[in-house]
């Protein structure tokens, strides 16, 4: 078993907490950090603290932003009557890369998962219903991961929003359990085009 000095071991341990980072990658990152000049480390630390302090959630759609409303919600050229519901900001970014969607978003912050003790009350679903009920919305597009949790969440939201507007779900050319952030732009564009009606 490899033994590290305590400060290095602690640094590696912090990197291992990052999603998708295993022990080897954590070690590589820690060793890379140690090779950098102190000025670079100070700039990096400052950037981390600034992002953590100044980036919050859009009061309208819950996307990440440093303003009250995110850039997408403020954009008057976007179709404000077309809302795409995603689980996380990373899914929003994946759809934006596809350059197909011209509406706005609502980030619910996860998926309903009883096994993980995540119920609807822990997600931004109530705020979505309020947003739709108070506005003239032509269509809600559900772009949630094709999984048991994604299906459960889509059906739940679909039932809540059915009295207010048309609800559709994007078509998928990918296997169950796939993460939207890893899907290529062409597949995502086709998924948006081929969406199906839920209500």
Curated annotation (Swiss-Prot):
Report the GO molecular function annotations: DNA binding; zinc ion binding
SUPFAM superfamilies under this entry?
A: Recombination protein RecR (SSF111304)
What intrachain disulfides are recorded? none
Keyword annotations for this protein, in alphabetical order, are: DNA damage, DNA recombination, DNA repair, Metal-binding, Zinc, Zinc-finger
Q: Which InterPro entries match?
A: DNA_Rcmb_RecR, Rcmb_RecR, Rcmb_RecR_Znf, TOPRIM_dom, TOPRIM_RecR
Superkingdom, taxonomy of origin: Bacteria
- What biological function has been recorded for the protein in this entry? May play a role in DNA repair. It seems to be involved in an RecBC-independent recombinational process of DNA repair. It may act with RecF and RecO.
Can you tell me which family this protein belongs to?
Belongs to the RecR family.
Q: What is this protein called?
A: Recombination protein RecR
The record lists the organism as Prochlorococcus marinus (strain MIT 9301)
* Gene behind this protein: recR
């Amino acid at each position: 078993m490899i033994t590290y000095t305590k400060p290095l071991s602690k640094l590696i341990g912090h990197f291992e907490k990052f999603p998708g980072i295993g022990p080897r990658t954590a070690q590589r990152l820690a060793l890379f950090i140690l090779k950098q000049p102190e000025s670079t480390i100070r700039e990096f630390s400052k950037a981390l603290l600034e992002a953590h302090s100044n980036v919050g959630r859009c009061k309208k759609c819950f996307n990440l932003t440093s303003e009250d409303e995110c850039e997408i919600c403020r954009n008057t050229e976007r179709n404000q009557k077309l809302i795409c519901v995603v689980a996380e900001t990373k899914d929003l970014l994946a759809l934006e890369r596809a350059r197909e969607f011209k509406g706005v978003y609502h980030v619910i912050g996860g998926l309903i998962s009883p096994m993980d003790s995540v119920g609807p009350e822990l997600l931004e679903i109530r705020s979505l219903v309020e947003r739709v009920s108070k506005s003239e919305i032509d269509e809600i597009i559900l772009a949630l991961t094709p999984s048991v949790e994604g299906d459960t969440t889509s059906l739940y939201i679909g039932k809540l929003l059915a009295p207010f507007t048309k609800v559709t779900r994007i078509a998928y050319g990918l296997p169950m359990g796939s993460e939207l952030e890893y899907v290529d732009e062409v597949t995502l564009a086709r998924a948006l085009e081929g969406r199906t009606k839920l209500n």
